[in-house]
Amino acid sequence: MNKAKRLEILTRLRENNPHPTTELNFSSPFELLIAVLLSAQATDVSVNKATAKLYPVANTPAAMLELGVEGVKTYIKTIGLYNSKAENIIKTCRILLEQHNGEVPEDRAALEALPGVGRKTANVVLNTAFGWPTIAVDTHIFRVCNRTQFAPGKNVEQVEEKLLKVVPAEFKVDCHHWLILHGRYTCIARKPRCGSCIIEDLCEYKEKVDI
């Protein structure tokens, strides 16, 4: 895909959604961090249902520590992998209190040192909480970038590297959100909704379907 096509795709996505954001509910960097930790192999809807009950009780590292692992589990049992997630949350809260004055660090290395936090989670937090021009690549974005040929790659690392290289600076902060929403609602895994796609004429997917 050439530069002009990519620019037009990003321009249309921006025109369609000028102020995109995550569908996870949060009101602080800490709430976002916990929500993203919970979102692995879970839907944003299921995470939001759990945090709607959890956050009124505990939305700081200290309050979460008071709940303890078993206490956290009672609020997140509807989410997959809740046992390991509860343990990671408590370990993370302890580190935040002991090493970061109870604050979520605006630092990639410090974030990735937290239990359960990998590059993708760190990218989401840095981008959505702190406005960094990072681009977290999940399954939706991986699919969209390969299917459209916007930024093809054999794995998420290659796709992220390509995106950071080809996406102009003015689009970088919002790019993650545009692509994930496009993959979640239009360029879906099975039977993509090409007929209602705003970038269908620019897409290089060879098996486009007019639905």
Curated annotation (Swiss-Prot):
Cofactor stoichiometry and binding remark: Binds 1 [4Fe-4S] cluster. The cluster does not appear to play a role in catalysis, but is probably involved in DNA-binding and proper positioning of the enzyme along the DNA strand.
Residues where [4Fe-4S] cluster binds: C187, C194, C197, C203
EC number: 4.2.99.18
Cofactors: [4Fe-4S] cluster
Keywords per UniProt: 4Fe-4S, DNA damage, DNA repair, DNA-binding, Glycosidase, Hydrolase, Iron, Iron-sulfur, Lyase, Metal-binding
Pfam families per UniProt: EndIII_4Fe-2S (PF10576), HHH (PF00633), HhH-GPD (PF00730)
Reaction(s) the record says it catalyses: 2'-deoxyribonucleotide-(2'-deoxyribose 5'-phosphate)-2'-deoxyribonucleotide-DNA = a 3'-end 2'-deoxyribonucleotide-(2,3-dehydro-2,3-deoxyribose 5'-phosphate)-DNA + a 5'-end 5'-phospho-2'-deoxyribonucleoside-DNA + H(+)
Gene Ontology terms: biological process: base-excision repair, AP site formation; base-excision repair, AP site formation via deaminated base removal; cellular response to UV
Residue span, HhH domain: 108-127
Keyword tRNA processing: no
Family, similarity comment: Belongs to the Nth/MutY family.
Subunit structure, as described in the record: Monomer.
Function text: DNA repair enzyme that has both DNA N-glycosylase activity and AP-lyase activity. The DNA N-glycosylase activity releases various damaged pyrimidines from DNA by cleaving the N-glycosidic bond, leaving an AP (apurinic/apyrimidinic) site. The AP-lyase activity cleaves the phosphodiester bond 3' to the AP site by a beta-elimination, leaving a 3'-terminal unsaturated sugar and a product with a terminal 5'-phosphate.
Protein name: Endonuclease III
Organism the protein comes from: Escherichia coli (strain K12)
